[in-house]
């Protein structure tokens, strides 16, 4: 029996009905494959007047060339072929000897709307960052209204735009300044790659995030980049601005003197004997770079009036809360080139990524509101977002043996504890209070009541005396202190060193008393009240092989920027709310320069809030791993 094309089309479309009715349908393999699909193709590009050619390649500023056409199975159609297809109706259509799938009405509508949008965009032009969002169906908030993302429409870059994207991806060789012999001899191959990445991206007019794992030498790579700008004459007017946590000011200055002695760096902070002053126009040019803290940068209004040749944010997760005064102030600074250094660009949620990218590449992720709406739609993974931001983020892990073949192993061990009867009774009292608070109808008021209870629960897990505000820190009153005694006795017996982290400054002296008795000698402590000049002395003392056997540190004050590789054990006395902070603290010991295997002990009281926090942290680690996973095949330009 022979069928006409319309009869065959009707049969193929009705196969699901036959199968639901229990009829077995057997087809040749050729018919089992999905038929080619008719799609609208929009090509975006820059005209010659919107491009710049210089030593590091082609740069695109905005997009003004848009064309709308049609493809069939990925192959371009002529206007005549498209007209023939659309005139044959909808569904499965026989075309050039094969079946194709056509939704004629939808294709006509898409082409009409895109042609209208293309004429407007060609007339007005759109910023490059908006064009990048369009290519991945990213966050909306476009300056020109365009049709919503649709599976029947594909976006492609034109020749000039593709060349720029290939340069961003590192696919096209560009001119990168040679490193001075001193840096060339010191830097590892992956660090030279990081320097090239920073230079390549920033010379295109984009901001770059170096998101290497902690301990891979982000500071060294940034110093190499700054020194290249100095040698190119880019720092002869105003100096570059570096913003970093207070604990890293002296570290930056020492690293610059060590690796790039011709790069003059000054400190803008009250702790400096001769601080740099932005108001002093005569002395602005006395250095190539000035470093200050986030707090100083946010409250020094004179900085907002200056146009720096370059801005570096170290530990850039400090601006993660987009709505905070600090984050807004830092994002308002003017910098011709911008880079961010952060081993943890996302700690809790994707909104933190928006804040970071809004500093580096304003507008890339759309408005904050449109980005929040966009991320809620990412139910099947982060591929669209990953493709959009990946060209501007370079992330390497020190666990990659190709990068650091001699780094020892790190083993993470949960150290479970039980509450003592006294702790359990205090804990239950707070749980009863929590249940009563949950009946509060006002969400804001309820939250303000819940947070203090959660803090008290964590204090009880540490020791009843911390909750009660007394000095009776007898170990037998706390299951966690007894577990800590056992753990540190084993470390002391092996004559090894350990560092301990806690979020509670008040408990540090009592932990020190406990451990001094176990190790038979005093240790070191470092917290937010430790003067900045004294912090380096503490690190130097601990790093001596004959130095103190332990160091107790406050998590927020000492979790970044310190090198404590003499420790082969890291103990987290209590748990913080995001894994990135804990990981950063751990990496004070587990970093380049560590030659011993590192054991990470996390004290967890069973059946308490600490169990819940542990599960939550595992979920957050999975989110960050998913967002930054994958290789170059997931970049925007592919």
Language model feature labels by segment:
Residues 291-297, 301-305, 328, 364-470, ...:
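Inter-lobe coupling linker of SF2 helicases/translocases
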Residues 230-324, 372-373, 479, 520-547, ...:
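SF2 helicase/translocase NTPase motor core
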Residues 196-204, 219-235, 329, 359-360:
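Walker A/P-loop NTP-binding motif
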Residues 230, 402-423, 428, 441-562, ...:
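Conserved Helicase C-terminal RecA-like lobe
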Residues 166-211:
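Conserved pre-motif I regulatory segment
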Residues 320, 325-328, 333-370, 404-432, ...:
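SF2 helicase/translocase ATPase core recognition
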Residues 213, 314-315, 573:
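Walker B catalytic acidic pair
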Residues 1-164:
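Accessory nucleic-acid engagement/destabilization modules that flank
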